[in-house]
């Protein structure tokens, strides 16, 4: 296919204007992809509940794939760019006491509890492990951070990590996992 007039050039506008994100070389237009921010953060260690009914901030000691999002101070998942983000978390909860205990899990944005983000989980009797996950979508300002908080009145409640196992060989399981992805 041939054109009498180029689509665009660096000196003249054709059918389109070269601007941010677009380049033109000999009539060929190229656009860069806008890579959104993302991050995967996890903890390979158990996290205890040393004080009943106190706020525990989930800590992270491992970073997976990430772009524009990082961990600050071990607990704050911090974004470079403002935007709408979706957060997905998974925890492994356990307890060693009898009866029913409640673990509350919620989100903080820049140190302030996020309304509507709490979920409660009943841990019944002495149970080995229970997995739970949740998600939340929110606007985060540039330089802002989120934290995954949890609490329980029962000090035997922990976020537990699984060791590697054999017969058959199985990998470790981390106590907390969070994926944060910018969606706009």
Residue positions per predicted region:
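Surface-exposed, low-helix, low-complexity loop/repeat segments of extracellular attachment proteins
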Residues: 1-33
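Extracellular jelly-roll beta-sandwich "head" domains, especially the C-terminal globular C1q domain
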Residues: 32-184
């Amino acid at each position: 296919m041939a054109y009498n007039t180029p689509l665009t050039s660096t000196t003249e506008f054709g059918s389109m204007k070269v601007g941010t994100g677009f380049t033109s070389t000999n009539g060929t237009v190229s656009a860069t992809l806008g890579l959104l921010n993302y991050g995967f953060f996890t903890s390979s260690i158990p996290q205890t509940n040393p004080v009943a009914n106190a706020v525990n901030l989930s800590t992270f000691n491992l970073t997976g794939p990430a772009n524009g999002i990082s961990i600050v101070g071990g607990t704050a998942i911090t974004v470079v760019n403002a935007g709408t983000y979706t957060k997905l978390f998974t925890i492994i909860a356990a307890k060693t006491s009898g009866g029913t205990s409640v673990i509350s899990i919620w989100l903080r944005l820049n140190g302030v509890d996020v309304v509507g983000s709490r979920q409660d989980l009943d841990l019944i009797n002495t149970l080995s492990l229970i997995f739970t996950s949740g998600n939340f979508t929110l606007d985060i300002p540039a330089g802002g951070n989120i934290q995954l908080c949890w609490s329980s009145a029962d000090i035997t409640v922990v976020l537990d990590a699984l060791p590697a196992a054999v017969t058959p060989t199985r990998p470790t399981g981390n106590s907390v996992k969070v994926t944060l992805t910018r969606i706009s």
